[in-house]
Amino acid sequence: MKQQTNRNRRWVLASRPHGAPQMDNFRLEEDDVATPGEGQVLLRTVFLSLDPYMRGRMSDEPSYAPPVEPGCVMVGGTVSRVVASNHPDYRPDEWVLSYNGWQDYDISDGEGLVKLGDNPQHPSWSLGVLGMPGFTAYMGLLDIGQPKEGETLVVAAATGPVGATVGQIGKLKGCRVVGIAGGAEKCRHATDVLGFDLCLDHHADNFPQQLAQACPQGIDIYYENVGGKVFDAVLPLLNTSSRIPLCGLVSGYNATALPDGPDRLPLLMATLLKKRIRLQGFIINQDYGHRIHEFQQEMGRWIKEGKIHYREQITDGLENAPEAFMGLLAGKNFGKVVIRLADDA
């Protein structure tokens, strides 16, 4: 269904999921497009970013950000154009980075909007390699991982928007990079396009043995996006004074209980202690928001020089957002997942 000029479609949280989200956890609503008041702008969503963190916002467990309440619009970063403006700093047709969520239109007072120029070459990249995922990769690896030339860097979810960027930055810093991904096609992309030294399929029956063979000198940096059995295979290979930037644990986002089997916490704690391993979680905007301009300048330069490659998976139509999101959580995506809402994209 095409975007309309006078009606606003929006996906709201219909109910909180128990386990993996299902279609009945979402509800598509529609009403008239609102009119901006004094000091406000009306934004039309062109691109919507879908990211794993949104699963946490669907639950009401305590976290670093408040949950989406039932009946409210699903959250999400967006690239938008100004339709109408009563704000002195914005004019119609301008492109902006915004936070409209899963809907066609939104009203903003201008706070938090980032101008993208009149005719950005790749506007959706502001939701990926030049946005939150790229920033997450950059700061997590460089500030927490602190890569050194000749070290072995292992990256989980190696072809996702964060993992792919981590691995490429690691190569720029002189690391030997081993990726972990799901399936032969993704692994080929990691080595042939992204320049990883190796990439292993975590679906393989002998994955732990393959990882040990791929890292004969151990692991100096493990960029954690996944958790679960991948982390179990990594743990015994970690070197003394290794570093683990903890970005995400997507394998457990839909979990409703602790995994079966023995308690692994004592082994983890003992390994961290004996090997003096640094394991640090981070929330990108809260912890590193003040360094966004540093990232934008450096990443922009690398892209211009052809040193960073980026892949998107674009789905057309706001109506397809829930299905694309559920596929993302199931690992069916190949690249940054973006919903394209408008024909001018």
Residue ranges of each PLM-predicted region?
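C-terminal hydrophobic helical "lid"/dimerization subdomain
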Residues: 2-6, 286-345
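Short glycine-centered segments of the SAM/dcSAM-binding site in methyltransferase folds
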Residues: 95, 152, 176, 242-243, ...
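Short amphipathic alpha-helix with an adjacent loop that forms part of the alpha/beta core around
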Residues: 206-216
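Short glycine/proline-centered loop/turn elements that form peptide/ligand docking sites
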Residues: 85-89, 179-189, 203, 207, ...
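Glycine-rich beta-strand-centered segment in the early N-terminal region that forms part
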Residues: 32-50, 58-102
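Glycine-rich phosphate-binding loop and adjacent beta-alpha segment
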Residues: 229-308, 342-345
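Mid-domain Rossmann-like dinucleotide-binding core that forms the NAD(H)/NADP(H) cofactor-binding site
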Residues: 127-205
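NAD(P)H dinucleotide-binding glycine-rich loop of Rossmann-like/cofactor-binding domains
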Residues: 74-81, 89-157
